[in-house]
Amino acid sequence: NGIAVILDVALNHAFGRNPMDRMWMNDPDGDGWGSPSVENPYFNFSAMHSYNVGNDFNHQQPRTKNYVKRVIKQWIEEYKIDGFRWDLSKGFTQNCPAAVAGGQDNCTNTYQQDRVDVLKEYADYSWSLDPTHYVIFEHLGTNTEEQQWANYKIAETPSKGVMMWGNMNANYNELLMGYSANIAGMTSQSRGFTANRLMGYAESHDEERLMYKNLQYGNTTNPAYNVKNLDIALSRMSAIGAVSLLVPGPKMIWQFAELGFDK
């Protein structure tokens, strides 16, 4: 019916019941649950980036790369999935251990060549199976690094390039609450992308609801237009469409945001 089906895939980590963890894990109490051992050929003993949940995959390991490609192949060839949204793509580096000079958080948020290379490799493999496959990264990093993917193979036919999540929550918060805000970052051009590969959004599962903040912190300077008023706050939420969906390029829309969902 012309509707693309896109999966959210978390290939940066797995949890302790994963068989690739359980075959090489620390399990002193013998309950079948533990963290990866130093011998594990898939997982890092400790996370190599600052936003880890679960157990951190080592994407420089050939076995891990083979596993990821098998997952990609299964979904594309068997289920004809149209694209993947890759969770936490910042986690695909081996360069940022806890004791790294300058701090793990700073390292994770700066340009890492190993991460650029391995994610291009996975994108290439996806496109080799389906040249029209949608590749989307939840990276939320520097423009310099994101440009490496957004502009990658953009001139090919069909045009490729990775779509990058664009978190504009703070800016839209200020705008919707009735304060001065700059939402220029919603455009691909503002980030140095050659084509429209920014998937901008005002709200996601990771932030407080915009509607909640309208009611709690909205601008009350003008008594005739008090943003804390429910009807006014709701009207501002519906305006999200007018000020974001018309910006060229793909968008991510959080469930019922335009109707004032605040739970």
What are these regions (language model features)?
Residues 80, 106, 112-262:
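Conserved alpha/beta catalytic core and glycan-binding cleft of carbohydrate-active enzymes
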